[in-house]
From Swiss-Prot:
<dbReference type="GO" id="GO:0051920">
    <property type="term" value="F:peroxiredoxin activity"/>
</dbReference>
<keyword id="KW-0676">Redox-active center</keyword>
<dbReference type="InterPro" id="IPR036249">
    <property type="entry name" value="Thioredoxin-like_sf"/>
</dbReference>
<dbReference type="InterPro" id="IPR024706">
    <property type="entry name" value="Peroxiredoxin_AhpC-typ"/>
</dbReference>
<comment type="function">
    <text>Thiol-specific peroxidase that catalyzes the reduction of hydrogen peroxide and organic hydroperoxides to water and alcohols, respectively. Plays a role in cell protection against oxidative stress by detoxifying peroxides.</text>
</comment>
<dbReference type="InterPro" id="IPR045020">
    <property type="entry name" value="PRX_1cys"/>
</dbReference>
<keyword id="KW-0560">Oxidoreductase</keyword>
<dbReference type="InterPro" id="IPR000866">
    <property type="entry name" value="AhpC/TSA"/>
</dbReference>
<keyword id="KW-0575">Peroxidase</keyword>
<feature type="domain" description="Thioredoxin">
    <location>
        <begin position="5"/>
        <end position="179"/>
    </location>
</feature>
<dbReference type="Pfam" id="PF00578">
    <property type="entry name" value="AhpC-TSA"/>
</dbReference>
<protein>
    <recommendedName>
        <fullName>1-Cys peroxiredoxin</fullName>
        <ecNumber>1.11.1.-</ecNumber>
    </recommendedName>
</protein>
<dbReference type="GO" id="GO:0005829">
    <property type="term" value="C:cytosol"/>
</dbReference>
<comment type="similarity">
    <text>Belongs to the peroxiredoxin family. Prx6 subfamily.</text>
</comment>
<keyword id="KW-0963">Cytoplasm</keyword>
<keyword id="KW-0049">Antioxidant</keyword>
<feature type="active site" description="Cysteine sulfenic acid (-SOH) intermediate">
    <location>
        <position position="49"/>
    </location>
</feature>
């Protein structure tokens, strides 16, 4: 493994200890056809991290519907992760709507890696140089890696410790990535599942008509260039 990973790179396989036990192979844990999201947080028992993971618990059923497996990571111990679960679930229950079952029980719907020696976090470029523990050791940033079924990196996001992530946005991005992995379209600004898409600029008009028929809405622009071509969400 090298320090840091770029879009399109093969994501490394690794072994890891988690709050749910030892994972001998990250690839085997993901499986052959699933997507995966590896997300790091700076530290257990901290306010922003607790609210983030509570939201992920709420959204876990939505990720599962999309065949996405979730796994967390920080430099805390597996035992610390296990003790933290009750706090996460308590915050989750505070934010649950009536009838929600995602926050019931006292078990997270995803494991959290205990990267105490900071090996994975360092090699994957997850460290935040501005955040340190009481001993001066660097802590992980709020990183998100989305990994496709072929085990390549599809998206990476790196937030500082002071800024919590919007996991509804991560869910939206998954919808876009999964759609554009199988359809020759791109998703425009603020797109949500079911919204119109745009034809890829690499596809000429003749090929676009073969793919999408006559239902292409070409937007007239001052430049006279016909690159903004809208199509309905592909089935």
């Amino acid at each position: 493994m090298t320090k840091g990973i770029l879009l399109g790179d093969k994501f490394p396989d690794f072994r890891a200890e988690t709050n749910e036990g030892f994972i001998p192979s990250f690839y085997d844990w993901i499986g052959k056809d699933s997507w995966a999201i590896l997300f790091s947080h700076p530290r257990d028992f901290t306010p922003v991290c607790t609210t983030e993971l509570a939201r992920l618990v709420q959204l876990a059923p939505e990720f599962k519907k999309r065949n996405v497996k979730l796994i967390g990571l920080s430099c805390d111990s597996a035992e610390s992760h296990r003790k933290w679960v009750d706090d996460i679930m308590a915050v989750c229950k505070m934010k649950c709507n009536d009838g929600d079952t995602c926050c019931s029980g006292n078990k997270l719907p995803f494991p959290i890696i205990a990267d105490e020696n900071r090996f994975l976090a360092t090699e994957l470029g997850m460290m935040d140089p501005d955040e340190r523990d009481e001993n001066g050791n660097a802590l992980t940033a709020r990183c998100v890696f989305i990994i496709g079924p072929e085990k390549t990196l599809k998206l990476s996001i790196l937030y500082p410790a002071t800024t919590g992530r919007n996991f509804d946005e991560i869910l939206r991005v998954v919808d876009s990535l999964q759609l554009t992995a199988v359809k020759l379209v791109a998703t425009p600004v603020d797109w949500k599942g079911g919204d119109d898409c745009v034809v890829l600029p690499t596809i000429d008009d003749t090929e676009a008509k073969k793919l999408f028929g006559e239902k292409i809405n070409t937007i007239e622009l001052p430049s006279g260039k016909h690159y903004l071509r809208m199509v309905a969400h592909p089935k």
